[in-house]
Amino acid sequence: MLNDPFQRLGLDREILTVSQLNGRARALLEDVFAQVWVEGEISNLARPASGHLYFTLKDRQAQVRCALFRQNALRVREILRDGLAVRVRGRVSLYEGRGDFQLILDLLEPAGDGALRLAFEALKEKLAAEGLFAAERKRPLPAHPRSIGIVSSPTGAVIRDIVSVFRRRAPQVELTLVPTAVQGREAVAQIVHALELADRQGFDALILARGGGSLEDLWCFNEEVVARAVAACATPVVSAVGHETDVTIADFVADLRAPTPSAAAELLAPDSSDLQRRLDGLQRRLQLRMRHLLAARRLQLDGLSRRLRHPGERLQQQAQRLDDLELRLRRAMQRRLQGDAERLARLDTRLAAQHPERLLGLLRQRLEHLAERLPRAMRSTLRERRQRLEATAQTLQAVSPLATLGRGYAILLDERGRAIRAAVQAHPGQRLHARLAEGALELRVEAAFPSPPQPD
């Protein structure tokens, strides 16, 4: 007789294999927990080549293995990562090969703000594919804006910070608030309307601004209609939503993203002190340039004046020279007469001493003859010199440009002082200087008519 406690108790013993045990446990679990929702945090995410996803879902006290097969993983595989809070649906099962308790999932969605982040990434990918984020769409901000439109809440620190920066750096810029809600159910429609209204006002640039907050607080700036309203603006838009770490879809669509509203004001407000320094430098350069230009024009004018000296001045010089020659000739004749007289006196003295009567008579005759010839010679010489001077004066008068001017003609000069000799040297609208016989004119060319070609 066998010593069997089960037999003594009258019980039949059923011995299961490990596979049988795991199979029965699996069937029991799948029957009782055919569909459950579980929330937790992903860890130990594995992505094998098969396309299935395996990870551990955990909370603070426990964890469970999860399997998400390929057909159900396609929609979410790109956003899953360790640490992501998710909400999953599936059935409880047992992996018989290892006896591992696990969840077989058919649905997974981000939990908390995870759903918002999923929507954020989907819209970001969609708008990027349309080219709304492309660099070639970005417009430069105005260097010296005169008016800025601010699309923001009329209350709070944001508008005060922006106004403070502009008052400090560029008080001359006109600021206009286009009020809108920036949080809540009405915010999206109000922001779109405010952007459309501001874009029609002719501002040099727009600032779309809001203070910091959670992802839910800033979500209106991640709505597609707001993003498209920003993209449709003809006015350059600076997005200044939240703090430096906050990123919205509006930031990607705007022409420029500023980390904070104050930074947006800094970017658009030119420093007035720096502008004044630049203006002073430009003024000094302009004054120096004008002095150099005036000096060059004076030199050019002096040169032209010397080249266009009046022929009368040359005649005056020739007349002065003739008078000088006449004076010198008179003095020379006087000196010669005086010398002859002195020599005659000496000869007379010598003759008187020697009494050469015959020689004295001859000398007296010769002297008388010379005295008769001398005035004629002087008159002849003066007449010849005067005739030469008159001929020279007539020649100068004939070739003088002022003689031509005196007949009603004019000399045309361009802005560089060059003479205009043909119509092709001038063009309509050009300013010319006309020199007349008396005075000058400033002219403007209405039309130029070149001479027709001469026949062969």
From Swiss-Prot:
One of its GO terms (biological process) is DNA catabolic process. Pfam families: Exonuc_VII_L, tRNA_anti_2. Its main location: cytoplasm. It is an enzyme of class 3 (hydrolase). Keywords: Cytoplasm, Exonuclease, Hydrolase, Nuclease. Heterooligomer composed of large and small subunits. This is Exodeoxyribonuclease 7 large subunit. The gene is xseA.
